[in-house]
């Protein structure tokens, strides 16, 4: 992520700050999704990821479009995972967010290496959906691997609800990715601009 422009650095710092502070801020004011779902009587393991997965996908795809750097996914994903491990040390399943960010970073590299994909809002939106879906899937995988027996029993006992949360995360991430593409069009890096625009053809 070297040789970034000043405005790219500012964007990166701002989104990194949001990624690492949003959970503790929401926790401090009583609006953490897990608490909200619990108060509404609809709590379910992993359900908050249908909020955080698409939200992070939206932010990271916008930053990806702004900087043209695939590393924004694993770098900010790592920082977010570290932040969550300090705020919620008992919830080791948050390590799944790191795995999702690494895989999404690899997908972002593939997008950059294929000009047709990089210039397609559809592929960029699907990248956001992929990250949001992976965010939820990896959370569930890490919960099954490291979580409590009670959590595992609830998740495996309600497969349709679990799948619904995963699919919902993917769909919301895709929609927010499309919105991010529209919002970032005036600011996007040249690699994402159609050839006719970039070369004045």
Place the predicted regions along the sequence by residue.
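Hydrophobic transmembrane alpha-helices
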Residues: 2-71, 105-113, 181, 185
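Hydrophobic alpha-helical transmembrane segments
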Residues: 9-14, 54, 70-78, 95, ...
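Hydrophobic core segments of alpha-helical transmembrane domains in multi-pass membrane transport
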Residues: 15-23, 106, 173-181
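Aromatic-anchored segments of alpha-helical transmembrane domains
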Residues: 16-25, 77-89, 129-140
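Interfacial aromatic-anchored transmembrane helix boundaries in multi-pass membrane proteins
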Residues: 27-32, 36, 79-110
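Membrane-embedded alpha-helical hairpins and interfacial helices in multi-pass inner-membrane proteins
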Residues: 28-32, 37-45, 119-201
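Membrane-helix interface "capping/anchor" motifs
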Residues: 62-75, 114-121
């Amino acid at each position: 992520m070297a040789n970034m422009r000043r405005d790219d650095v500012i964007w990166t710092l701002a989104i990194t700050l949001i990624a690492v502070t949003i959970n503790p801020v929401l926790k401090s004011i009583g609006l953490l999704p897990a608490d909200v779902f619990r108060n509404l009587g609809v709590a379910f393991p992993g359900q908050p990821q249908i909020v955080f997965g698409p939200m992070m996908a939206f932010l990271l795809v916008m930053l990806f479009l702004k900087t043209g750097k695939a590393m924004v996914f694993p770098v900010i994903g790592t920082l977010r995972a570290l932040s969550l491990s300090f705020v919620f040390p008992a919830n080791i399943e948050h390590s799944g967010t790191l795995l999702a960010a690494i895989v999404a970073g690899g997908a972002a590299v593939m997008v950059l290496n294929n000009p047709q994909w990089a210039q397609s809002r559809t592929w960029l939106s699907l990248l956001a959906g992929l990250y949001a879906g992976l965010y939820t899937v990896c959370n569930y995988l890490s919960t099954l691997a490291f979580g409590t027996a009670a959590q595992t029993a609830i998740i495996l006992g309600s497969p349709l609800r679990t799948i619904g949360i995963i699919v919902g995360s993917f769909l919301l991430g895709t929609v927010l990715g499309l919105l991010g593409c529209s919002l970032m069009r005036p600011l996007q890096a040249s690699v994402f601009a159609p050839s006719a625009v970039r070369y004045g053809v």
